[in-house]
Regions:
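General beta-strand structural signal in soluble alpha/beta enzymes
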Residues: 50, 120-124, 173-177
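Active-site-lining helix/loop region of Rossmann-like oxidoreductase modules
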Residues: 143-218
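NAD(P)+-binding Rossmann beta1-loop-alpha1 motif at the extreme N-terminus of oxidoreductases
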Residues: 1-39, 43
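Rossmann-fold NAD(P)-binding glycine/threonine-rich loop
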Residues: 91-139
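Short, conserved loop/helix-junction motifs that constitute active-site signature segments
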Residues: 78-84, 116, 140-142
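Rossmann-like NAD(P)-binding element
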Residues: 45-47, 53-86, 91-96
Length: 218
């Protein structure tokens, strides 16, 4: 599969490394230093390349958006239309001084879907730090793998992203639609799964409890 990565920093860069190692083709983009980005891509092997956000958007069967919250408008402007694309949204709504408040009581995932209305958005790869993801990918046996939660309104898109989560060495756990994404979004707080480490069995129980409205974080 071809994966365009917009934002090849800690989360996006690590995901690109894991995807390339699993046999996917990746294109890294959105850097102030194109030469350094090219070096980063070269370090991932023959399946990786670099370019502009528009290149990543056109290249990818899947596009990963992994930029700071304040950089999203610029990144999307450079990417151009994402209509029909599966977009993995790894962003968290951090702003200077804390978490960015959102209008209308929507989740951050819903807000980003409004910013790219034609995209098939799936929220994932955002609940655990980049260092933790890098060090814990690929645990064996499978039942000990670390969980990455996902939310989205497009079931087929979620299936694709769940497969990529598995390819990256994690276990996927579906929390529902974009309106259900709140518990997996920043900040870390009681009643959320953001910042918490789960195994598959515990994640299934947490997902069921969230749907039933009776979940409290460990």
């Amino acid at each position: 599969m071809k994966i365009g990565v917009i934002g090849a920093g800690r989360i996006g860069g690590n995901a690109a490394r894991l995807f390339a190692a699993a046999g996917h083709d990746v294109l890294l983009s959105f850097s102030r230093d194109p030469d350094r980005l090219a070096e980063q891509a070269a370090g991932l092997g023959a399946r990786a390349s670099s370019g502009r956000p528009r290149d990543a958007a056109q290249f990818g069967d899947v596009v990963m958006l992994s930029v700071p919250w304040s950089a999203i408008p610029d990144a999307l402007g450079q990417a151009g239309p994402l209509d029909g694309k599966i977009v993995i949204d790894t962003t968290n709504q951090f702003a200077p001084g804390g978490v960015q408040p959102l209008p209308g009581g929507v989740t951050a995932a819903q807000y980003n879907q409004q910013r790219m209305p034609g995209a098939r958005l799936v929220k994932s790869f955002n609940t655990l730090t980049s260092g933790f993801q890098a060090s814990q990918a690929g645990r064996t046996p499978p039942e000990t793998r670390v969980v990455l939660f996902l939310c989205g309104d497009d079931e087929k898109a979620k299936q694709v992203v769940a497969g990529l989560i598995e390819d990256a060495g994690f276990a996927p756990a579906d929390l529902g639609g974009l309106a259900d994404a709140g518990p997996m979004e920043a900040p870390r707080r009681p009643g959320s799964v953001y910042g918490e480490e789960y195994r598959p069995a515990d994640a299934r129980a947490a997902a069921e409890a969230l749907r039933a409205g009776r979940y409290s974080s460990p």
